[in-house]
């Protein structure tokens, strides 16, 4: 056999099956693919569904509460906030929540209120468009029904296209997930089981009042402060390096700057706190740190040797949340 024939045969594409040509619903990556192939969705149609397009680095950029939305999606277990819709759907009651039963993207309650979830099992790679897609579907869904995630493309609307982006969110942090069923006379066994499972992960969390987008939490025998910041990553790293080199990056005695989460295009520094500190006691130190950080962000002078070493150390503490 000649090389040219070998190449031709190896590059030939198999004929498209009937399953390839149908519109396959989006399901969890580990679930059986709805096309009937017998494979998991991740290894079948989920492959193309997850690589339809590359989303923006900061999907929630331009929203007044970008950092809080990222916090609700990545580090806050149970929280909710009313959304203000614009255009033809202005006035419709929509609540943004961290997560819904069985990780549904959205749910229309019996009274018509839409609950829109940030934490789901599937996604296109653009969290803003995923939310917008679920919201559009929910606007036409019947009350009492969960809403699945549809096909999202680069032409799909963003959440910013459907809601008021200039009004900061009024976020309520919950101790559990009972807000899922507030006012509901009856709930299914599946929802109750999901509520109980989720409740076991609802670590005590408090949103600080003294600084924006900062959340105290206790996880077992540890307390942390997680603070989502809007600054450009490189600029923020330089400022934090200046503070670290000057030993000004802590929140008081016994506290320690430990890691930086990277998520949805922004950075979330994390501090360890002594057990028993509590949220109230960290309000003033966090505010003081915010003042020091603001000053460091204004400093555009070249980093010193000590600051460059500090910056190198900080980069090793970065963890990307996906």
Give each language-model segment a name.
Residues 138, 142, 243-247, 289-296:
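Conserved short hydrophobic interaction patches
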Residues 254-255, 260-322:
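Alpha-helical oligomerization segments
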Residues 1-88:
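Acidic/negatively charged segments and metal-coordination signatures
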Residues 2-14, 22-26, 225-239, 289, ...:
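Membrane-interacting alpha-helical segments
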Residues 95-97, 114-118, 225-227, 269-271:
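Generic recognition of long tandem-repeat/solenoid scaffolds
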Residues 52-109, 167-192:
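Short Lys/Arg-enriched alpha/beta "domain-start" segment
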Residues 110-223:
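Internal, hydrophobic cores of structured domains that mediate oligomerization or house catalytic pockets
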Residues 176-282:
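A contiguous, surface-oriented mixed alpha/beta subdomain in the mid-to-C-terminal portion of proteins
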């Amino acid at each position: 056999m000649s090389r040219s024939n070998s190449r031709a045969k190896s590059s030939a594409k198999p004929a498209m099956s009937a399953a390839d040509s149908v519109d396959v619903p989006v399901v969890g990556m580990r679930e059986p693919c709805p096309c009937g192939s017998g494979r998991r969705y991740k290894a079948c149609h989920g492959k193309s569904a997850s690589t339809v397009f590359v989303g923006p680095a900061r999907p929630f950029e331009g929203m007044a509460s970008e950092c809080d939305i990222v916090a609700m999606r990545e580090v806050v277990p149970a929280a909710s906030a009313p959304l203000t819709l614009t255009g033809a759907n202005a006035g419709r009651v929509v609540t943004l929540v961290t997560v819904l039963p069985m990780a549904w993207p959205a749910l229309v309650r019996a009274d018509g209120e839409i609950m829109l979830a940030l934490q789901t099992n599937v996604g296109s790679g653009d969290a803003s468009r995923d939310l917008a897609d679920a919201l559009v579907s929910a606007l036409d869904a019947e009350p009492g029904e969960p809403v699945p995630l549809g096909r999202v493309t680069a032409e799909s609307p963003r959440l910013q296209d459907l809601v008021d982006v200039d009004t900061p969110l009024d976020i309520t942090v919950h101790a559990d997930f009972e807000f899922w069923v507030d006012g509901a006379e009856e709930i299914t066994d599946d929802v109750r089981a999901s509520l109980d499972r989720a409740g076991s992960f609802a670590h005590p969390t408090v949103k600080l009042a003294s600084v924006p987008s900062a959340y105290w939490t206790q996880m077992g025998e540890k307390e942390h402060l997680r603070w989502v910041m809007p600054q450009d990553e490189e600029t923020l790293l330089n400022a934090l390096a200046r503070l670290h080199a000057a030993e000004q990056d802590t929140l008081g005695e016994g506290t320690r700057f430990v890691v930086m989460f990277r998520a949805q295009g922004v950075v979330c520094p994390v501090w360890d706190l002594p057990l028993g500190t509590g949220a109230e006691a960290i309000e003033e130190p966090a505010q003081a740190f915010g003042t020091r950080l603001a000053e460091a962000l204004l400093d555009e002078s070249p980093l010193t040797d000590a600051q460059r070493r500090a910056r190198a150390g900080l980069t090793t503490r970065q963890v990307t949340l996906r």
